[in-house]
Amino acid sequence: MNNVATAKPEIVMYTSATCTYCVAAKNFLKSKDQEWTEVRIDLDAAAREKMMTLAKRTSVPQIFVGDTHVGGFDDMMALHRAGKLEPLLAGGA
C-alpha cells in the first residue's frame, strides 16, 4: 500500500499589468483556493523570452501547472468544464 501523498504541483502564471484575462485567471484560481507564482513579463524581458520558449505563445496569461502547460484563460476554463483541471491542480493528472 502506497502511503505517499501526492504533492500539489506549483502553479506559475505569466501575466502583464493591463491584461484582463490575467485578472480573470487569478480570480478563478483564488476561487479554487489555489496559490500561484506570478511572473510579470511586462517588467522582465528575460521572463517574457522564457515564457515564449516554454509556451510557444506570446499572449498572456500563460498558465503552467507543474510541468503541464495549461495555456491561457480560455484553455484553463475549457479544462475546468471538461472536469480535467481539478485533478491536474490536485497533482493527480
PLM regions: where:
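Short secondary-structure transition/capping segments
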Residues: 2, 48-52
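Short secondary-structure boundary/capping segments
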Residues: 2-5, 61, 77
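Local sequence-structure signature of Cys/Sec-based thiol-disulfide redox active-site neighborhoods
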Residues: 2-35
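Short alpha-helical
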Residues: 20, 45-46, 71
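Thiol-based oxidoreductase modules, predominantly thioredoxin-like and allied folds used
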Residues: 35-48
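Thiol/disulfide oxidoreductase modules built on the thioredoxin-like
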Residues: 53-59
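Non-catalytic, surface beta->alpha helical segment in thiol-disulfide oxidoreductase systems
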Residues: 65-93
